[in-house]
């Protein structure tokens, strides 16, 4: 199989493909035939899950700011602001929730998963930080599977109810507001 050896203008690609960047995740993979997952993500996204990826993730913020909410080893939430033009390398296995506001774009690169390599999508209570729900997947289609996991959580009131404090997370996710 021959691969195309050609560059292209990424900003033009983003402009021509904006309609593909839809909530909740707003992601579009650029190349299907690579050993990397290279995708453009736009804002505003509508997600509150924390992704636990077995590989590092490279963030390059093209326009605006991205807020990567991370869970530290001590269990605390910490927000990393990735400003326009900045890069950020997120280490493997750090639970993180990338938040994008309107009219922002970024590039995220991570490696494709090996057969049998699993990763998690985790939801924590907004009130007490208790783990509410966890989905473990063999990731093969990042555009499809992340949306399915988010939809499954949002549409099920039982798993949106915290068993620790009783808080019920709303079905609809509002745009991120950095506090």
UniProtKB/Swiss-Prot annotation:
Binds 2 Fe(2+) ions per subunit. GO terms for biological process: anthranilate metabolic process; L-tryptophan catabolic process; NAD biosynthetic process; quinolinate biosynthetic process. Its cofactor is Fe(2+). GO terms for molecular function: 3-hydroxyanthranilate 3,4-dioxygenase activity; ferrous iron binding. The keyword 4Fe-4S does not apply. Gene3D superfamilies: Jelly Rolls. GO terms for cellular component: cytoplasm. Fe cation 2 binds at residues 125, 128, 162, 165. Its EC number is 1.13.11.6. Keywords: Dioxygenase, Iron, Metal-binding, Oxidoreductase, Pyridine nucleotide biosynthesis. It catalyses: 3-hydroxyanthranilate + O2 = (2Z,4Z)-2-amino-3-carboxymuconate 6-semialdehyde. It is an enzyme of class 1 (oxidoreductase). InterPro entries: 3hydroanth_dOase, RmlC-like_jellyroll, RmlC_Cupin_sf. Catalyzes the oxidative ring opening of 3-hydroxyanthranilate to 2-amino-3-carboxymuconate semialdehyde, which spontaneously cyclizes to quinolinate. This is 3-hydroxyanthranilate 3,4-dioxygenase. It comes from Bacillus cereus (strain 03BB102). The lineage of its organism: Bacteria, Bacillati, Bacillota, Bacilli, Bacillales. The gene is nbaC.
């Amino acid at each position: 199989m021959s691969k195309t050896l050609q560059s292209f203008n990424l900003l033009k690609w983003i402009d021509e493909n904006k309609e593909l960047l839809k909530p909740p995740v707003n992601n579009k993979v650029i190349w299907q035939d690579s050993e990397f997952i290279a995708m453009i993500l736009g804002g505003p996204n509508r997600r509150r899950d924390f992704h636990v990826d077995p590989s590092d993730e490279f963030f390059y913020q093209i326009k605006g700011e991205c807020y990567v909410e991370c869970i530290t080893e001590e269990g605390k939430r910490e927000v990393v602001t990735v400003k326009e033009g900045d890069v950020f390398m997120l280490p493997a296995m750090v639970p993180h929730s990338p938040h994008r506001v309107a009219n922002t774009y970024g590039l995220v690169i991570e490696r494709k998963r090996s057969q049998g390599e699993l990763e998690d999508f985790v939801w924590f209570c907004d009130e007490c930080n208790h783990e509410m729900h966890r989905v473990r997947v063999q990731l093969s289609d990042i555009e499809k599977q992340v949306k399915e996991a988010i939809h499954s959580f949002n549409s099920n009131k039982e798993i949106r109810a915290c068993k620790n404090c009783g808080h019920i997370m709303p079905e609809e996710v509002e745009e991120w507001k950095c506090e």
